[in-house]
Amino acid sequence: GCIPKHKRCTWSGPKCCNNISCHCNISGTLCKCRPGLFGW
């Protein structure tokens, strides 16, 4: 499984969905995505 953007996450996993452009943010709480082709 994976976590959709703007949902709660932890650095230990599971991964954010579409992890080409999405990652758990600096505080390890929310999946954030870069804008662009893969960011939506």
Swiss-Prot record:
Instruction: Let me know which tissues express this protein, per UniProt.
Output: Expressed by the venom gland.
- Judging by the UniProt lineage, the source's domain of life is Eukaryota
Q: Which GO terms describe its cellular component?
A: extracellular region
Posttranslational modification = Contains 4 disulfide bonds.
User: Which positions does the record annotate as the modified residue Tryptophan amide?
Assistant: 40
Q: Which cysteines are joined by disulfide bonds?
A: 2-17, 9-22, 16-33, 24-31
Which UniProt key words apply to this protein?
Amidation, Disulfide bond, Knottin, Secreted, Toxin
Looking at the keywords, is Secreted present?
A: yes
Q: Which CDD domains match?
A: Spider_toxin
Q: What is its main location?
A: secreted
**Annotated InterPro entries:** Spidertoxin
A single GO molecular-function term is: ion channel inhibitor activity
Could you tell me where this protein is found in the cell? Secreted
Does the UniProt entry include the keyword Glycoprotein?
Answer: no
Q: Where are the transmembrane segments?
A: none
The UniProt similarity line reads:
Belongs to the neurotoxin 02 (plectoxin) family.
Q: What is known of its domains?
A: The presence of a 'disulfide through disulfide knot' structurally defines this protein as a knottin.
Q: What is this protein called?
A: Toxin CSTX-17
Q: From which source organism is this entry?
A: Cupiennius salei (American wandering spider)
